[in-house]
């Protein structure tokens, strides 16, 4: 974080320190484009005061231009100081959570802008954000025309109407890393929320990835979406699959521990520590690589202009990323630019899988962050802190229920 930030209107802002309750800053596609302020194809990274809902303007005290001190996130700090970090991992697109979860497993947005889905007019609401939601989201066709279509990656081979979407859609089928793993006989799981719950983000079901893919939701693949509590059981018993994704949510209310805006950073840091400890203390530690990251940048300031993906689409702002493994280089900062597609590329190269498309084929796979010849690093002790009073007062408000992120 620089000492001072100059915005496009000439305002100079001194970055602040965030409270434990993460500020509520807009981060829709429109917000991200406003913040990046792309001029002649080059992001200027100085339009943060123009985030569309006013959540980072002068009246909001430029709250998005702020960060956390190491003492506020002791587990993340310990992991970053012991293992490897990437300071050049960009979002694959200027999209919030729904798009971030798509490209995490496809290396593509399949024509979607990535904006979080909204209710379709005249249709009863369904479950979550995906194929069973009866929701719509913007999709850009080959000619550049944007239209609202079901928030579902269809699979027309299933024999279902509309490929599994609730109404006809121009979106095409796109393979996922799950398909590759299955074809290779490799196990995988998504640890998250298996059904909607009466909580923010459906108790995490909105983030569970599988429901947005007809091929996952409507086939036996959906059996690989299990409650997040099962991650701890698998880690403790040495039965983790070859590939795991942990999303915030599930029966133990991990949505409140998600690091999402309006929730407690202490709760999130505690939860990350609990997840990492389960692996570190389990039988699978010696063969594990953990990538800790966030599905988007949350609306918070970043000064580094993102470039383009291999398929020439625009990247979005950076997301923090920590690599935790016995074979991660100790106290190493990986400065090679990449995206979530780099995690796909790492997985594919590790297991000898073919790339899904140009973005993971051309992505940097965190090669320099690992040294498989080194003496394996030992686990780092994680801590659990009491929640501050502000975290105990957090309640679901109408504003949170209607938050498009």
Predicted regions, residues:
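N-terminal pro-sequences and low-complexity stem/linker regions of secreted or lumenal proteins
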Residues: 1-405
């Amino acid at each position: 974080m620089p000492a001072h930030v100059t915005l496009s209107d000439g305002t100079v802002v001194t970055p602040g320190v965030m409270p434990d309750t993460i500020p509520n800053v807009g981060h829709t596609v429109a917000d991200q484009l406003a913040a990046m302020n792309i001029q002649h194809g080059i992001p200027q990274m100085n339009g943060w005061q123009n985030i569309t809902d006013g959540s980072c303007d002068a009246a909001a005290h430029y709250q998005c231009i702020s960060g956390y001190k190491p003492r506020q996130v002791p587990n993340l700090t310990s992991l970053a100081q012991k293992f490897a970090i990437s300071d050049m991992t960009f979002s694959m697109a200027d999209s919030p959570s729904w798009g971030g979860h798509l490209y995490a497993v496809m290396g593509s947005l399949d024509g979607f802008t990535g904006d979080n889905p909204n209710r379709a007019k005249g249709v009863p609401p369904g479950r979550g954000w995906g194929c069973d939601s009866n929701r719509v989201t913007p999709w850009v066709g080959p000619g550049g025309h944007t239209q609202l279509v079901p928030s579902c990656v269809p699979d027309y081979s299933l024999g279902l109407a509309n490929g599994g979407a609730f109404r006809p859609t121009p979106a095409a089928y796109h393979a996922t890393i799950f398909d590759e793993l299955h074809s290779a006989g490799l196990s995988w799981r998504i640890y998250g929320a298996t059904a909607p719950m009466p909580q923010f983000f459906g108790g995490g079901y909105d983030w569970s990835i599988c429901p947005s893919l007809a091929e996952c939701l409507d086939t036996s693949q959906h059996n690989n979406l299990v409650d997040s509590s099962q991650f701890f059981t698998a880690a403790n018993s040495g039965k983790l699959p070859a590939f795991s994704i942990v999303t915030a949510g599930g029966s133990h209310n991990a949505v409140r521990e998600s690091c999402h805006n309006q929730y407690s950073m202490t709760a999130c840091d505690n939860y990350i520590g609990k997840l990492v400890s389960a692996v570190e203390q389990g039988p699978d530690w010696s063969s594990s690589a953990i990538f800790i990251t966030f599905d988007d940048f949350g609306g918070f300031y970043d000064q580094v202009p993102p470039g383009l993906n291999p398929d020439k689409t625009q990247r979005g702002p950076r997301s923090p990323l920590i690599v935790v493994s016995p074979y991660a280089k100790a106290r190493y900062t990986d400065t090679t630019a990449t995206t979530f597609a780099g995690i796909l590329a790492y997985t594919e190269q590790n297991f000898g899988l073919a790339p899904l498309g140009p973005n993971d084929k051309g992505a940097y796979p965190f090669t320099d962050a690992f040294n498989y010849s080194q003496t394996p690093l030992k686990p780092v002790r994680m801590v659990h802190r009491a929640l501050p009073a502000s975290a105990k007062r957090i309640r679901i408000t109408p504003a949170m229920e209607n938050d498009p992120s």
